[in-house]
């Protein structure tokens, strides 16, 4: 279970950090003085969002290893519950980064 906790928390941190940073970048980008700074913050947000997908794939891979065809595992149940939430959150941040 530790693997799943680590990946879950890592994905959560990546999304929180990416969203926070792209929101800051969007607030700063209109200031001529802060354009370069906001661009770096936006790059960081993009990198965190990309890292989310690395952990996402690792999480799916670990779940695939745990499959029991006769019974849903705790990990699968957990993933079903959080997967949609994470995907919606990811898509929202991705739109903000692309809009930036």
Regions of interest found by a model, annotated:
Residues 1-100:
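Non-heme di-metal
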């Amino acid at each position: 279970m530790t693997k799943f906790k680590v990946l879950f928390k890592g994905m959560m941190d990546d999304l929180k950090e990416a969203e926070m940073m792209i929101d800051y970048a969007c607030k700063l980008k209109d200031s001529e003085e802060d354009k370069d700074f906001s661009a770096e913050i936006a790059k960081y947000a993009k990198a965190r969002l990309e890292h989310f997908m690395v952990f996402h794939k690792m999480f799916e891979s670990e779940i695939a290893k745990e499959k029991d065809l006769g019974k849903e595992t705790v990990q699968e149940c957990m993933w079903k519950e959080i997967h949609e939430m994470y995907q919606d959150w990811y898509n929202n941040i991705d739109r903000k980064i692309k809009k930036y």
